[in-house]
Amino acid sequence: VNKSEYLNQPEVIDFLAWFERLDHDDNPSPFNHKYEIETRGRGTTKTPWACTSLYNAYEKYSWRFSYTDLFTDKKIKGTSYSVSKKALDDFQNRLHDSIIRNCNETCYKACNMILDWGGVLGSEKKGNKKRLLELKPCLTKHLSEVKSIFESNEVTLGKKYTIVENKNETQIAMNAGFTKIYSLLCTDFIIYDGRVGAALSLLVRYFLQQKNPKPSLVPESLSFYYGQARNKNVNRNPSLDPYIFRALSNSPAVHIRNNLKANWIVSEFSKNTASKFKDQNNPSRCIEAALFMIGYKV
């Protein structure tokens, strides 16, 4: 199933129509969501968070980040959407420039900073940094081929995603870290992590509950995977029998399929929405930010 075929499925068409009405003033079922943000470390104080619409969730974006700028050796910190966007714009410019110039060193630094910003860098011995170091000798070529695949009109919801390097078939890496790199590498590609997956799953559940008075199973086209939180007090599983959603695991192909479906949904929504998102510089990024905030706890 490619993008066109996916978006033309009846249940996807219905979900998009419902999704686009969420922030309309005349919506009989306005979207509201609230939770308490758990304190990091040993603290017990919880911070209440609530939104009265999808757009309001974007307006209330807050996420603490820090990373080291490998080009200036400065430590950069922030919490707001605008400061985070400034960092992402810088990463994206450096990433694209390095690929144009075929400079693996600059490309590696840009990717390293993206992962560091996202809190998913890992180390030289394990995790995303280890994988990045393995790819470093041919990183610009590798990412160029990944970009070509993900931006193709013919990319499908397949069982595996690979590229051929030195006559060897290499599986495309995908997890909560690499989705951040691909989001800045490719056009119309959102960051799909556990929180975004949880939010989309929750919205699908609400849609199905409102659409069908008689409960039904979640159609595969709208089955999004959520990610478990590290904190056991943070629930990101929106399942409510018979609406059952699955958790992301270590399968790159499953993560990519979910990311592609989310890309297509968010891109289509951003082009057709009559909400305040349309007035933003990058509607898809703003919608992603809203989903990220909603999906902290469901």
Predicted features and spans:
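Helix-hairpin-helix/helix-loop-helix acidic hairpins
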Residues: 84-170
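Generic structural signal for hydrophobic core residues of well-folded globular domains
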Residues: 114-124, 181-188, 200-203, 269, ...
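Eukaryotic partner-binding/assembly regions in large regulatory complexes
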Residues: 44-111, 118
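Catalytic cores of nucleic-acid editing and processing enzymes
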Residues: 133, 141-153, 167-172, 210-213, ...
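C-terminal accessory module of base-excision DNA glycosylases/AP lyases that mediates lesion recognition
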Residues: 1-65, 194-199, 203-298
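Short, solvent-exposed positions on alpha-helices
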Residues: 105, 190-194
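Helix-hairpin-helix
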Residues: 161-186
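Alpha-helix boundary/N-cap detector
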Residues: 10, 79-86, 102-105, 109, ...
